[in-house]
């Protein structure tokens, strides 16, 4: 799946609130940096942490709460 499609699906999960999505991605990236395991099987090696976080949100594996 292309990153544009993943971003569109992730935006759907947060009711098209780009600010909320960016906050959720940043929070998940910090969790990954601090040792959390990805919740998805990586479709390609060497994915960036932001791509992993966005894909997890798009798949509904990470719940996003309003800030």
Swiss-Prot record:
GO terms for cellular component: DNA-directed RNA polymerase complex. Keywords: DNA-directed RNA polymerase, Nucleotidyltransferase, Transcription, Transferase. SMART domains: RNA_pol_Rpb6. SUPFAM superfamilies: RPB6/omega subunit-like. The keyword Transferase applies. It catalyses: RNA(n) + a ribonucleoside 5'-triphosphate = RNA(n+1) + diphosphate. InterPro entries: DNA-dir_RNA_pol_omega, Pol_omega/Rpo6/RPB6, RPB6/omega-like_sf. GO terms for molecular function: DNA binding; DNA-directed RNA polymerase activity. The keyword Chaperone does not apply. It holds the Pfam family RNA_pol_Rpb6. One of its GO terms (biological process) is DNA-templated transcription. It comes from the Bacteria. Signal peptide: none annotated. Its EC number is 2.7.7.6. Belongs to the RNA polymerase subunit omega family. Promotes RNA polymerase assembly. Latches the N- and C-terminal regions of the beta' subunit thereby facilitating its interaction with the beta and alpha subunits. HAMAP family: RNApol_bact_RpoZ. The RNAP catalytic core consists of 2 alpha, 1 beta, 1 beta' and 1 omega subunit. When a sigma factor is associated with the core the holoenzyme is formed, which can initiate transcription. This is DNA-directed RNA polymerase subunit omega. It comes from Nautilia profundicola (strain ATCC BAA-1463 / DSM 18972 / AmH).
